[in-house]
Design a protein with these regions (language model features):
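Conserved active-site and SAM-binding loop architecture
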Residues: 1-154
Length: 154
């Protein structure tokens, strides 16, 4: 029996904690979508780490860590792996005006693979007790309340 490679897309990926769990469980990421640049940089770095580990070239990652210059974005490491590895981190805000462009990027990354699962953690401020207390009645009008609907579109 041939083992199927299970794939996922991570929406509202943050720095990739949920992705890390799925990767450790044997899933392969197709895309991580996150709006914050620092988190996207972390996603690119972790993608490079996983690629280099699979290729038996972890020493490249270790050298990067030893020689990393504070304030750099990681491009020294990212240039050591094929572009499609780091391109899996899509730095974009998910919304009506961006969704079609995101779909195009995901489709290009996906190729002929199927997506087995959509994962992600939308911003919790509008759901959490602390967030609701802080925002008061404005919580009902917070657009983050509606972000879960994008899971269906993917």
């Amino acid at each position: 029996m041939i083992k199927k490679e299970y794939t996922f897309i991570d929406l509202f990926a943050g720095a990739g904690g949920l992705s890390e769990g799925f990767i450790k469980a044997g899933f392969s990421p197709i895309a991580h979508i996150e709006m914050k640049q620092d988190a996207c940089n972390t996603l690119k770095t972790r993608s490079a780490f996983h690629y280099l580990t699979a290729q038996g070239k972890l020493s490249i990652y270790e050298d990067y860590l030893k020689n990393k210059v504070e304030g750099t974005d990681g491009s020294i490491l990212w240039n050591q792996v094929p572009p499609e590895v780091t391109n899996a981190a899509i730095c974009a805000t998910i919304g009506e005006d961006t969704i079609n462009g995101i779909f195009k990027k995901v489709d290009a990354l996906k190729g002929d693979k199927t997506v087995d699962i959509i994962i992600g953690g939308p911003p919790c401020q509008a759901y959490s007790v602390a967030g609701r207390a802080r925002m008061g009645k404005a919580v009902d009008e917070d657009p983050r309340n509606e972000l879960y609907k994008y899971y269906v579109q993917f």
